Amino acid sequence: ACQASQLAVCASAILSGAKPSGECCGNLRAQQPCFCQYAKDPTYGQYIRSPHARDTLQSCGLAVPHC
């Protein structure tokens, strides 16, 4: 199930470009199928589409989704 709240541990990485934690990467991996849904969400979309979000995904070894 998609739970955007699980991405809260990634907030500092997504907002400031800080190195993501292991917990952040694990949660991103689990939520990966939901990224496009989040990108379209008015609340979360601006964060998911930000350059730092891309960097965070790449730091975790995850592909940046093409929605």
Curated annotation (Swiss-Prot):
Disulfide feature: C2-C34, C10-C24, C25-C60, C36-C67
Organism superkingdom: Eukaryota
Pfam families hit by this protein: Tryp_alpha_amyl
GO aspect biological process, one term: lipid transport
Keywords: Disulfide bond, Lipid transport, Lipid-binding, Transport
GO terms, molecular function: lipid binding
Function of the molecule: Transfer lipids across membranes. May play a role in plant defense or in the biosynthesis of cuticle layers.
Stated family: Belongs to the plant LTP family. B11E subfamily.
Listed name of the protein: Non-specific lipid-transfer protein 2P
Species: Triticum aestivum
Source lineage: Eukaryota, Viridiplantae, Streptophyta, Embryophyta, Tracheophyta
